[in-house]
């Protein structure tokens, strides 16, 4: 005969989702044109995912001009490659799709892990010490907003 343990059932407590996304969203989704978007991705940026995520959280759901102003004033090293990426995405939108930069809106800004560059540093007594430099992929999606 198999014996069973009686375990007291503990209900899971749901975490409250932060309201930052709702607060940061300034344009209702019905005003965003669904198929009028521009994707721009940059691969293998030599930067930690967490450092890039800190900057991307600030620019998500903002207009292009506001984003450029924020990125220029941010004191983080991660803001410069992201600024170049946003500039490039906006240039692609105006050149290839004839969008106006004043109506561009960042709907998606995400970062993902990439490869880790491994090097060795010489240490005392002929030993070596590994150095791991992490990299990341960053994707920006710009959407056009309808005039109201």
Curated annotation (Swiss-Prot):
Any one Gene Ontology BP term: translation
One GO cellular component, as annotated: large ribosomal subunit
Gene Ontology molecular function, alphabetical: rRNA binding; structural constituent of ribosome
SUPFAM superfamilies membership: Ribosomal protein L22
Subunit-level organization: Part of the 50S ribosomal subunit.
Keywords noted in UniProt: Chloroplast, Plastid, Ribonucleoprotein, Ribosomal protein, RNA-binding, rRNA-binding
Role played: This protein binds specifically to 23S rRNA.
Name under which the protein is recorded: Large ribosomal subunit protein uL22c
PROSITE patterns with a match to the protein in the record: RIBOSOMAL_L22
PANTHER family referenced in this protein's UniProt entry, alphabetically: CHLOROPLAST 50S RIBOSOMAL PROTEIN L22-RELATED, LARGE RIBOSOMAL SUBUNIT PROTEIN UL22M
Record-linked InterPro entries: Ribosomal_uL22, Ribosomal_uL22_bac/chlpt-type, Ribosomal_uL22_bac/org-type, Ribosomal_uL22_CS, Ribosomal_uL22_sf
Family of the protein in this entry: Belongs to the universal ribosomal protein uL22 family.
Subcellular location: Plastid, Chloroplast
Keyword field contains Ribosomal protein: yes
Transmembrane segments: none
Key word Magnesium present: no
